[in-house]
UniProtKB/Swiss-Prot annotation:
InterPro entries: Ribosomal_uS10, Ribosomal_uS10_CS, Ribosomal_uS10_dom, Ribosomal_uS10_dom_sf. PANTHER family: 30S RIBOSOMAL PROTEIN S10 FAMILY MEMBER. It holds the Pfam family Ribosomal_S10. It comes from Sphingopyxis alaskensis (strain DSM 13593 / LMG 18877 / RB2256) (Sphingomonas alaskensis). Involved in the binding of tRNA to the ribosomes. Keywords: Ribonucleoprotein, Ribosomal protein. One of its GO terms (molecular function) is tRNA binding. The keyword Ribonucleoprotein applies. This is Small ribosomal subunit protein uS10. HAMAP family: Ribosomal_uS10. Part of the 30S ribosomal subunit. Belongs to the universal ribosomal protein uS10 family. GO terms for cellular component: ribonucleoprotein complex; ribosome. GO terms for biological process: translation.
Length: 103
């Protein structure tokens, strides 16, 4: 039987919260005896929004806002059943989107 890999993709607006969640997942997986590849930083997506400053006529006066989405990738190679149980019980901070794929 071929061993399965677990690919975890994390997204967040705040990179500090994202890095903390990444280290929590990596420490949990290492503690249960699984091999880890990563964390791999993926490109940050920057969305920019331009709006008029005033409600009336002044088209030349504008303001720009941006939203940055930071991403990280973790590969867990040869996960043990204890690894899967520990990851299911792990409580991560709010604001971190977690996508898990079995490969």
């Amino acid at each position: 039987m071929e061993t399965q890999n677990i690919r975890i993709r994390l997204k967040a607006f705040d990179h500090r919260v994202l890095d903390q969640a990444t280290t929590d997942i990596a420490d949990t997986a290492r503690r249960t005896g699984a091999l880890i590849r990563g964390p791999i930083p993926l490109p940050t997506r920057i969305e920019k929004f331009t709006v008029n400053r005033g409600p009336h006529i002044d088209k030349k006066s504008r303001e720009q806002f941006e939203v940055r989405t930071h991403k990280r990738l973790l590969d867990i190679v040869q996960p043990t059943p204890q690894t899967v149980d520990a990851l299911m019980k792990l409580d991560l901070a709010a604001g971190v989107n977690v996508e898990i794929k079995l490969a």
